[in-house]
Amino acid sequence: MKRKGFIMTVYPDKHDEYEKRHNEIWPEMVAELKKHGAHNYSIFLDKQTNQLFGYIEIEDEEKWSKMAETSINQKWWKFMKPVMKTNSDDSPVSTDLTEVFHMD
């Protein structure tokens, strides 16, 4: 497994809506994440900075990279666009982080 950390940004007045949408995540989205090798996926919110910290473990970069191309993922991005910063293709603006420490 490869561990990945990343930062995204939720709009200041959309914290509750962001959480609600994830609490009600579509079963087909979860299935697609798993199909593309996602495990142990969590997102944390810093309410003071509006930053989201995502942590995910993936089986393989190539397999994971294909997730963005799926129709359900494209639909999810459009659904989430009103609550967070996004790119022109509706994907979340995201910054990958460098792991500097790990302990099992």
UniProtKB/Swiss-Prot annotation:
What domain of life does the native source organism fall in?
Bacteria
Q: Which reaction does it catalyse?
A: alpha-L-rhamnose = beta-L-rhamnose
Database matches in InterPro entries = Dimeric_a/b-barrel, L-rhamnose_mutarotase, Rham/fucose_mutarotase
Q: Where does substrate bind?
A: 18, 41, 76-77
Query: What functional role does this protein have?
Result: Involved in the anomeric conversion of L-rhamnose.
- Subcellular location field: Cytoplasm
- Record-annotated active site: 22
The name under which this protein is listed is L-rhamnose mutarotase
